[in-house]
Amino acid sequence: MKTALITGVNGQDGSYLAELLLSKGYNVWGTIRRNSSPEYNTTRVDHIFEKINLVYADLTDMSSLVSVLQKAKPDEIYNLAAQSHVRVSFDAPIYTAEATGLGTLNLLESIRLTCPKARIYQASSSEMFGNNIDKDGYQRETTQLSPVSPYGCAKVFSYNICNNYRNSYGMHISNGILFNHESPRRGMNFVTNKVVNGAVKIVRREAEDLVLGNLAASRDWGHARDYVQAMWLMLQQDEPDNYVCATGVSHTIQDLVDYTFKSLGLNPNTYIKTSQKFERPEELEHLKGDSTKLRTKLGWKTTYTFETMLDEMIFVASNKLNKDVDTKKF
């Protein structure tokens, strides 16, 4: 039986990855940070709570990482923990750099000292590209990195230090350059769930409008279930590498709004307002990824479209108060 350690197991990706690994017979360990609301902190993994080993650790505290690694003795390590909200990174740039950037270095050094043969997945991000885009309109593994946010800068450091440790110490480290991926488990401060839940509240007459930022920004949105499958595939390869994980299809936030509101029988023009308060100091305008390498080399494929992903999110948001619907399985 393989043992896997997931940092940030209580996040969107961590919870789906834990489910996937359990289905494959893994012994799963997951780290969470201590905070003032431990019950809320484990909401996404409550349904598998008894099947995984939950431990407290923090990427900014190397001693806690060493302790967990010595206990778990993992064969595979998935580093998903981070301060992952781009807009928040402008308000908390130093913490973002420490947790998302230096935190990765703390983990790599801890692994090098305790279990250097373990295979490591690093959650890299399309935010590293910034507004750089190839002539054909896509971003891929060879596209120049030029981040436009503190979060993107921290992810570039993590990406580069992973490459450095792989080359310097022969460690099996793969960077997954993931484009935006969503689900019903996405945090409410991210635009997809903000739009979906905002629309549902309007239907229920719990809100009169929804205020958003730049509606023209476009993103390549996929489903988190598909993307954790890619993470696992990367660590099953004999040789580590870097891979873009994306659908190859881009939609604007206006597209997101239109589909969601019309699905619920609402006219978006009636309810949507915009405010510069929700725009970034430097905006990332366009993301669309080319995952040819991942698809051809590892056989990865998507099972959700933009529309079916949103359909699922709308269904769950609309049925959260319905006791006859088990929304935790989504």
Give the residues covered by each predicted segment.
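NAD(P)-dependent short-chain dehydrogenase/reductase
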Residues: 132-138, 156, 160-236, 248-253, ...
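N-terminal Rossmann-like NAD(P)+-binding domain of SDR-like oxidoreductases, especially those catalyzing
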Residues: 1-181, 225, 235, 304, ...
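C-terminal "lid/loop" region of Rossmann-like NAD(P)-dependent oxidoreductases
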Residues: 210, 214, 241-243, 251-258, ...
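C-terminal amphipathic/interface module of NAD(P)-dependent oxidoreductases
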Residues: 288-330
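Short secondary-structure junction motifs
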Residues: 117, 173, 207, 240-242, ...
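Non-catalytic, hydrophobic alpha-helical segments
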Residues: 227, 231, 245, 256, ...
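Residue-level signal for the nucleotide or nucleotide-sugar donor/cofactor binding architecture
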Residues: 60, 91, 99-102, 142, ...
